[in-house]
Amino acid sequence: MYYEVVIPAAGQGKRMKAGRNKLFIELKRMPVIIHTLKVFDAHAQCKRMILAINEEERQDFERLLKVHAFQTPVSLVNGGEERQQSVYEGLKAVKDADIVLVHDGARPFIKHTQIDLLVKAAIEKGSAVVAVPVKDTIKRVQEGKVEQTIERQSLWAVQTPQAFRHSILKEAHEYAERTGFLGTDDASLVEQLHGENVYIVQGDYTNIKLTTPDDLLVAKAIMDAERGY
């Protein structure tokens, strides 16, 4: 089954301290967002890639898309102030896909095998996310004091892509807009719907999100390892 992927790309990534949209930062002489788009462009089930962008950066994105040709159609829509609003605007641009993926533009290392499993899970169960078991000890802290050590066995660090039946994700965003709910990811919006469950597809620890300057060092190491440098 084919899918369309919505990629929120309007954020400025202040923690990266790059002074610009972090998706324009180059890894191995290619912008991060192009690395991410290439993954989906090469995936046979991807029908369309929708970028929710800052209108002020439209020309920058258009210029990149002209330089780097893709076989899969790419659509640009204006995003919102919050990530959730950007995804919603991208979702409105979905045309005829029964399955919709949402993916962080700053995660260029997602693998096709994980996308395959994720799409399969969304078809069968409605909603699924890529995640990895938490490796560190997690503690709840209040005003600098440890209040509780959380049992690690049931904790998973959720990544993207996240995949949903189009109808479910649309209903979740509409409900969030009506109620004013602001979630940290799209799965948290679906969790607000009565009777809807979200399922886990185990991912890979290399599927990092580029958030801080240190992440760029890790990203380069991952790329070197994958290319055998």
UniProtKB/Swiss-Prot annotation:
CDD domains listed in its UniProt record: CDP-ME_synthetase
Site (Transition state stabilizer): 15, 22
Signal peptide annotation: none
Chain positions of site Positions MEP for the nucleophilic attack: 152, 209
Pfam families: IspD
GO terms under biological process: isopentenyl diphosphate biosynthetic process, methylerythritol 4-phosphate pathway
EC top class named in words: transferase
Keyword Lipoprotein: no
PANTHER family, per the entry: 2-C-METHYL-D-ERYTHRITOL 4-PHOSPHATE CYTIDYLYLTRANSFERASE, CHLOROPLASTIC (PTHR32125:SF4)
Family membership: Belongs to the IspD/TarI cytidylyltransferase family. IspD subfamily.
Entry protein name: 2-C-methyl-D-erythritol 4-phosphate cytidylyltransferase
Organism of this sequence: Bacillus pumilus (strain SAFR-032)
